[in-house]
Design a protein with these regions (language model features):
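His/acidic metal-ligating clusters that form di-metal
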Residues: 25-48
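Metal-dependent phosphoester-hydrolase catalytic domains
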Residues: 37-43, 53-168
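Beta-strand-turn-beta hairpins that frame and shape the catalytic cleft
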Residues: 1-12, 165-168
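Active-site metal-binding loops of divalent metal-dependent hydrolases
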Residues: 8, 50-51
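A shared catalytic/ligand-binding motif for oxyanion handling
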Residues: 6, 20-23, 42
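Second-shell loop/turn segments in exported
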Residues: 12-22, 47-48, 90-95, 147-148
Length: 168
């Protein structure tokens, strides 16, 4: 199992002006994944983190080549389960009342087999418990951030995946 932990460049300065930096991060991730797969065709790889782009941005769809439908993913390709969550209106971060999914966990197609004698991907989610949500004011419903005047957690909701296998 190989884990790539990421924090891609910020959108500070404007989404379009900074897009090339995140696209470069996506290309580097793809290059690392390709290298690992050359060493082991059946490598199980997970790339995850705060990517500062959503599942439909060029850094994810083109540079990394992630696909949102399990059935369209070959073993050497990358599956992004968070694309489906965004299409359902869910998100990890909100800006001007628009949700996006900047925090993602993506897996190579080697995690998508129906052979549960080895670890396989089952499902993904966004962790949104009440204690993580702003309950009042301008940002009601947003992640409860930490500030000088309030105790909170983060401006992003956490994400998770379930990896399962058959018991012995």
């Amino acid at each position: 199992i190989h884990l790539l932990i990421n924090h891609w460049p910020s959108r500070s300065g404007g989404e379009q002006k900074t897009s090339a930096y995140r696209e470069a991060a996506g290309k580097l991730n793809k290059k690392i994944i390709d290298s690992l797969q050359q060493l082991s065709v059946n490598a199980k790889i997970i790339t995850m983190g705060d990517l500062n782009d959503g599942p439909h941005n060029k850094s994810i769809k083109v540079a990394l080549g992630a696909k949102g439908k399990k059935t369209a993913v070959a073993p050497h390709e990358i599956f992004n389960p968070f694309e489906a969550l965004l299409s359902k209106g869910l998100g990890t971060i909100a800006h001007q009342d628009a949700w996006d999914v900047f925090d993602q966990i993506m897996l190579t197609g080697t995690w998508l087999s129906s052979d549960y004698s080895t670890w396989q991907y089952w499902k993904a989610g966004i962790f949104q418990r009440n204690y993580l949500i702003q309950t009042q004011g301008k940002y009601k419903g947003y992640p409860l951030r930490h500030s000088l005047t309030e105790v909170g957690y983060s401006d992003h909701f956490p994400v998770y995946v379930y990896l399962i296998r058959e018991g012995k």
